[in-house]
UniProtKB/Swiss-Prot annotation:
It is found in: Cell inner membrane. It is a multi-pass membrane protein. Belongs to the UPF0299 family. The chain crosses the membrane at residues 4-24, 30-50, 63-83, 93-113. Keywords: Cell inner membrane, Cell membrane, Membrane, Transmembrane, Transmembrane helix. This is UPF0299 membrane protein YE2790. The lineage of its organism: Bacteria, Pseudomonadati, Pseudomonadota, Gammaproteobacteria, Enterobacterales. PANTHER family: HOLIN-LIKE PROTEIN CIDA-RELATED (PTHR33931), UPF0299 MEMBRANE PROTEIN YOHJ (PTHR33931:SF5).
Length: 135
């Protein structure tokens, strides 16, 4: 019984922390004239708290695992909502596919070139150094 109670409190604490970050993000969007959704700001707040180790990751891990486990179920209402526009989607299928393909290609190129640019002068540890005498 004690393990069940302890697990229940861990889930409750995780969901309260996640909800508080969501609420804080929504409050920031109401107070400031920015066009970023409150849920995104809430995730950024949660990320900042976790990455700065102000908030231990073990506190939110049970709730996150539960949400990730049932993530597919959480997307069902969105899929049903998209099906209301099935006629419009079929009419615009070609442009949608082309824009998805082109945007994916552009993102891959930009990420590839920018990563090469950022890491161009970085020396790899353990690799032999070449001097003029070796050539």
């Amino acid at each position: 019984m004690r393990n069940v109670t302890s697990l229940g409190w861990q889930y409750l604490r995780a969901f309260v922390i996640i909800y508080l970050c969501l609420w804080a993000g929504k409050a920031v969007t109401l107070l400031l004239p920015i066009s970023i959704p409150g849920s995104i700001l809430g995730m950024l707040i949660l990320f900042a708290l976790l990455s700065s180790q102000i908030l231990p990751s073990t506190w939110v891990k049970p709730g996150c695992h539960l949400l990730i486990r049932y993530m597919a179920l959480l997307f069902v209402p969105i899929g049903v909502g998209v099906m209301q526009y099935y006629d419009q989607l079929t009419k615009q299928f070609g442009p949608i596919v082309v824009s998805c393909f082109v945007s994916t290609l552009v993102v891959m190129l930009v990420v590839g070139y920018s990563s090469h640019y950022v890491h161009r002068e970085r020396k790899v540890m353990g690799s032999p150094t070449h001097t003029e005498e070796d050539k």
